[in-house]
From Swiss-Prot:
Pfam families: DYW_deaminase (PF14432), E_motif (PF20431), Eplus_motif (PF20430), PPR (PF01535), PPR_2 (PF13041). This is Pentatricopeptide repeat-containing protein At2g27610. It comes from Arabidopsis thaliana (Mouse-ear cress). InterPro entries: DYW_dom, E_motif, Eplus_motif, Pentatricopeptide_rpt, PPR_At4g14850-like_plant, TPR-like_helical_dom_sf. GO terms for molecular function: RNA binding; zinc ion binding. It comes from the Eukaryota. PPR repeats lie at residues 57-91, 92-126, 127-157, 158-192, 193-227, 228-258, 259-293, 294-328, 329-359, 361-395, 396-426, 427-457, 458-492, 493-528, 529-559, 560-594, 595-625, 631-661. Gene3D superfamilies: Tetratricopeptide repeat domain (1.25.40.10). The keyword Chaperone does not apply. GO terms for biological process: RNA modification.
Length: 868
């Protein structure tokens, strides 16, 4: 039979040239040579030919190996290489270069090391292609040490070698190494290619270094590489991440060939810069231009829907995802669940979670737990967390950090025990969440222990711990920690400054230190940040410097609700009721959405100024116009408003109409008003209510005792004092503080412990003489002890605020203002005396008592208008 030299040729195998060699035994052996890029269909046909060939030579094996490698069929390429090795065929550099690329794609470190050994054995490491592929293998396996070692030992390197190493570092955010190598390769005479520039630009984008990015952009244009897709995409990404959206859009419009990555960069960049509508517009343009959407396209736009809470659009995208076959992509699946959760469609999120079989996926479980927490489903979140563990899904660090926000349904100590077993407590993410949970429960010591155990403390962990100290008023610990932070080379962010400024707003904190931190914030260019400026506003208002608070408020480029509320409350506490109401009117004019806190500040302003009708009007606005249901705090404010004005019947009517029984705070307000307005019977009722709820509350006993003393009922007063002794209730002593040269000094009534006590009492005697020259007569009714008037006058003269003022007058330059803080209410006699002292000494004196600020001007007038 005659042997034919023609065989059937598949129509799709255009780039393959089958050649035949006729052996003596008449068997044809096929060689398949691949030219150009082999498509998947052609490679499939080539593979079939290879399998059907009765005999195969080395060239056939190598050709198919190259085809598999180029087509990304890594497992088949690996098996074929092992066959070549097993058959003892001759190896060369091209084979190892090809199979090392396969190893890099597989991230198979063991296989890569075996290939490395073979390269050493055959002496192929001097080949630049093999060395480059080996570097790529190690870098993709995150083995940077060995990857760099291979690179450093290479005798010859080309631009691909440099780019491979640089790209490996860039993928793992090792930015310093990227930029160092980028400069070094040019110094050594290797010109970067488009992929090298893309990697360097990516790093500059991550660091937000727009200036250096512009320099690289100039070099790219000079080299004519700005039109290439990798560089073009990286430039667009750079400008977007640096906030230069306009420049990014210009580059995008000039890009002739736009890949799906180009479109995705614009969508995610717009979203990151808060331009949600522009991002949606870009997505629609992408579809109009018939660009095939990728998984990243869908993930980006679904996240956008989550931010905008667009349920309908989310549902449409869900349908498109199913159509494109992307539903089982983890990023898309998680993005859909998050979007449904943020749109409050928890049933849809839960249905998706169950339908697509997320049972073993920790990311999906975490997304669902987070969704429940965002929708006030703390119990459901904790139940899901428990179910997750029962089904054998191990929580990761993000799961633990999310579930720790489910306080008080879950105990941080319970989660802490689980975290210790996994060693996650040492991670910054979980450690910070854990210490934050302890802080919210007031367990600052536990939080500090967790903080000390975190290995790499980032700025978030430091800020959280500072916030804890701010919450508990541990000023010294917070300031010490801030010093440690800066000494450690960590750069404070806006939240760090916000926390430390909140610490400085505490009663026992130094105003001077607060000003120093303000200066530090200015130096760091963070003083204009919204959270920092709001903290500054609050600090200055609480420390008695309402003018500085007002200045900060005016300079704010943007104001959030916290800023508006802080300014209203600040004015209210300083007795500037009309300014507080003007701020409220400005809010209304700008259509700022108000909350319950806004009206608490407004009611406080009306209360301190005795504006009863105004307070009633704003209460109606809150309920009728703003649709805010009155809370316990709002009712307490209205009771205070009526009580201070002597309208106790209206105050009692508010209490009667409250949905829940009044608490001790409201009854204490009634009791204080009864003392001022001589309503003994109602005062007795209020005291009984308080003592029944809080038997240890000394304020109730003291107010009732004082009320009896003022009415001359010493017998009833004695009974109250006896009851206090029987129950071991101690009266809170009156303290006053003053800050001089960044140091705080405290005084008790009749205090003689200060080193300058002699000078202080001499100053008080001098002031007493000058006060009497002005016609001052002590009001001994404020001394609630059964002693003679002479002794009562001596007691009045030694009240703690007077001692603090006397010390301030001798310890500070003449004419400088004084700020006194007192833990109790200033008595009427001291109020009059301080007005006269301010006039005599020609000084401004600010006193912060338990109710409000009193600004005593040098002309002897108080900001409260003698109504407090």
């Amino acid at each position: 039979m005659r042997f034919t030299t023609t065989i059937w040729r598949p129509p799709s195998l255009e780039n393959f040239k089958p050649k035949f060699r006729i052996y003596a035994n008449g068997v044809a052996q096929v060689r398949i040579y691949c030219f150009g890029t082999v498509s998947s269909s052609r490679l499939y046909n080539a593979h079939n030919l290879f399998d059907k060939s009765p005999g195969r030579d080395r060239e056939s094996y190598i050709s198919l190996l190259f085809g598999f490698s180029r087509d990304g069929r890594t497992q088949e390429a690996k098996r074929l290489f092992l066959n070549i090795h097993r058959l003892g065929m001759e190896m060369d550099c091209s084979i190892f270069s090809s199979v090392l690329k396969v190893s890099a794609t597989l991230c198979d470190e063991l296989f890569g090391r075996q290939l490395h050994c073979q390269c050493i054995k055959f002496g192929f490491l001097d080949d630049v292609s093999v060395g480059t592929s080996l570097v790529d293998t190690y870098m993709k396996g995150s083995n940077f040490k060995d990857g760099r070692k291979v690179f450093d030992e290479m005798k010859e390197r080309n631009v691909v070698t440099w780019t491979t190493l640089i790209s490996g570092y860039a993928r793992n955010s090792m930015n310093d190494e990227v930029l160092t190598l980028f400069m070094r390769m040019q110094n050594e005479g290797t010109q970067p290619n488009s992929f090298t520039f893309a990697a360097a630009l990516g790093v500059l984008a991550e660091e937000g270094v727009g200036g250096r990015g512009l320099q690289v952009h100039t070099v790219v244009v000079k080299n004519g590489l700005d039109k290439t897709i990798p560089v073009s995409n990286s430039l667009i990404n750079l400008y977007l991440k640096c906030g230069n959206v306009r420049k990014a859009r210009i580059l995008f419009d000039k890009t002739e060939v736009k890949s799906v990555v180009t479109w995705n960069s614009m969508i995610s960049g717009y979203a990151a810069n808060g331009l949600d509508l522009e991002a949606l517009g870009m997505f629609y343009s992408m579809r109009l231009n018939y660009v095939r959407l990728s998984e990243s396209s869908f993930a980006s736009v679904i996240k956008l829907c989550a931010n905008l809470k667009e349920l309908r659009f989310t549902e449409q995208l869900h349908c498109s995802v199913v159509k494109y076959g992307f539903l089982f992509d983890q990023n898309i699946r998680t993005a859909l669940m998050v979007a449904y959760s943020k749109c409050t469609a928890m049933l849809d999120a839960l249905r998706l979670f169950k339908e697509i079989g997320c049972v073993g996926n920790v990311v999906s479980w975490t997304a669902m737990i987070s969704g429940f927490l965002q929708n006030d489903g703390k119990e459901e979140a904790v139940d899901l967390f428990s179910e997750m563990k029962r089904k054998g899904v191990r929580p990761n660090e993000f799961t633990y950090s999310v579930i720790l926000t489910a306080l008080p349904v879950i105990s941080p100590s319970e989660v802490h025990a689980q975290v210790v077993k996994t060693n996650y407590e040492r991670s910054s993410t979980v450690g910070t969440a854990l210490l934050d949970a302890y802080v919210k429960l007031g367990k600052v010591e536990e939080a500090a222990k967790v903080f000390s155990g975190i290995d790499d403390k980032d700025i978030v962990a430091w800020s959280a711990m500072l916030a804890g100290y701010a919450q508990t008023g541990e000023t010294e610990a917070a300031i010490k920690m801030f010093g440690e932070l800066t000494k450690g080379g960590i750069k404070p962010n806006e939240f760090t400054f916000s926390s430390i400024l909140n610490v400085c707003a505490a009663t026992n904190a130094s105003m001077g230190q607060g000003k120093q931190f303000h200066g530090f914030a200015i130096k760091s260019r963070l003083d204009s940040s919204l959270c920092v400026s709001s903290a500054l506003l609050t600090m200055y208002a609480k420390k008695g410097n309402i003018e500085s608070a007002e200045e900060v408020f005016k300079r704010q480029r943007e104001k959030d609700l916290v800023s508006w509320n802080s300014m209203i409350s600040g004015y209210a506490q300083h007795g500037q009721a009309m300014k507080a109401l003007d701020v409220f009117k400005e809010m209304k004019k700008r259509k700022v959405k108000m909350d319950g806190v806004t009206f608490i500040g407004v009611f406080a302003a009306c209360t301190h100024a005795g504006l009863v009708e105004e307070g009633e009007k704003y209460f109606d606005i809150m309920v009728r116009d703003c649709k805010i249901a009155p809370t316990k705090e709002h009712n307490s404010c209205m009771v205070d408003l009526y009580s201070r004005a002597g309208q106790l019947e209206k105050a009692m009517k508010v209490i009667e109409n409250m949905p829940n029984p009044a608490g001790s705070t409201i009854w204490r307000t009634i009791l204080a008003a009864c003392r001022v307005h001589k309503k003994t019977e109602l005062g007795r009722l209020a005291a009984e209510k308080i003592i029944a709820m809080k038997p240890e509350d000394s304020a109730a006993y003291v107010l009732l005792s004082n009320m009896y003393a003022e009415s001359g009922d010493w017998q009833e007063r004695a009974k109250v004092r006896k009851l206090m002794n029987e129950r071991n209730v101690k009266k809170e002593p009156g303290y006053s503080w003053i800050e001089v040269k960044n140091k705080t000094y405290s005084f008790l009534a009749g205090d003689r412990s200060h080193p300058l006590k002699d000078q202080i009492y001499m100053k008080l005697e001098d002031l007493s003489t000058r006060l009497k020259d002005l016609g001052y007569e002590p009001d001994t009714s404020y001394v609630l002890q059964d002693i003679d008037d002479e002794h009562k006058e001596a007691v009045l003269a030694q009240h703690s605020e007077r001692l603090a003022i006397a010390f301030g007058l001798i310890a500070t330059p003449k004419g400088s203002p004084l700020l006194i803080i007192k833990n109790l209410r200033v008595c009427g006699d001291c109020h009059l005396v301080i007005k006269l002292i301010a006039k005599i000494e020609e000084r401004e004196i600010v006193v912060r008592d338990s109710n409000r600020f009193h600004h005593f001007s040098s002309d002897g007038v108080c900001s409260c208008g003698d109504f407090w």
